[in-house]
Amino acid sequence: MADSEEWLEEWLTVGKIVGVQGLQGELRVNPASDFPERFTVPGPRWVRSKGSPPREMQLKTGRQLPGKSLFVVRLDSVDNRDAAEALVGSDWMVPADDRPQLGEGEFHLLDLVGLEARLSPDSDPIGTVTDLISGGNDLLEIKRTDGSKLLIPFVEAIVPEVHLKDGWLLLTPPPGLMDL
């Protein structure tokens, strides 16, 4: 395993910096986490630009935009629009051991990435979950075995079973969803 892959295993990407807000260096973060305190409670956070290791920055303030899944955050060392724009596209990260404890049958959404997607428990996989897109409803991005991509709403009616230990999830899509 390459050194860069080794340090990546020590981190979880819990959001992506997708834009700037205003002139004072505020950043818009699209979360990939069900824990809003990662974007609102002041303290150390880590930001990783593509190809670089995460660097520690201090979160000063954070708030969720009303009616949206986006958070607006202010970092200690980012005080103008130019500095903020330099961080757009960066990952918002936490140490891998910073996962909140979960109850029986619960899982972290990020754990879905890498799972095989199947249409029945005994069938061959139709693809692999490659990303999670947060929004009004979370979407699973699945790379199909033919290389095409498929977006599946992550709701219990369509994804009724998740088998983390076995590395797969079950899809029961309504007619036509697989054809999109």
From Swiss-Prot:
It is found in: Cytoplasm. The keyword Transmembrane does not apply. One of its GO terms (biological process) is ribosomal small subunit biogenesis. The keyword Chaperone applies. One of its GO terms (cellular component) is cytoplasm. One of its GO terms (molecular function) is ribosome binding. It comes from the Bacteria. Residues 104-177 form the PRC barrel domain. InterPro entries: PRC_barrel-like_sf (IPR011033), PRC_RimM (IPR056792), RimM (IPR011961), RimM_N (IPR002676), RimM_N_sf (IPR036976), Transl_B-barrel_sf (IPR009000). Its main location: cytoplasm. Keywords: Chaperone, Cytoplasm, Ribosome biogenesis, rRNA processing. An accessory protein needed during the final step in the assembly of 30S ribosomal subunit, possibly for assembly of the head region. Essential for efficient processing of 16S rRNA. May be needed both before and after RbfA during the maturation of 16S rRNA. It has affinity for free ribosomal 30S subunits but not for 70S ribosomes. The PRC barrel domain binds ribosomal protein uS19. PANTHER family: RIBOSOME MATURATION FACTOR RIMM (PTHR33692:SF1). Belongs to the RimM family. Binds ribosomal protein uS19. This is Ribosome maturation factor RimM. The gene is rimM.
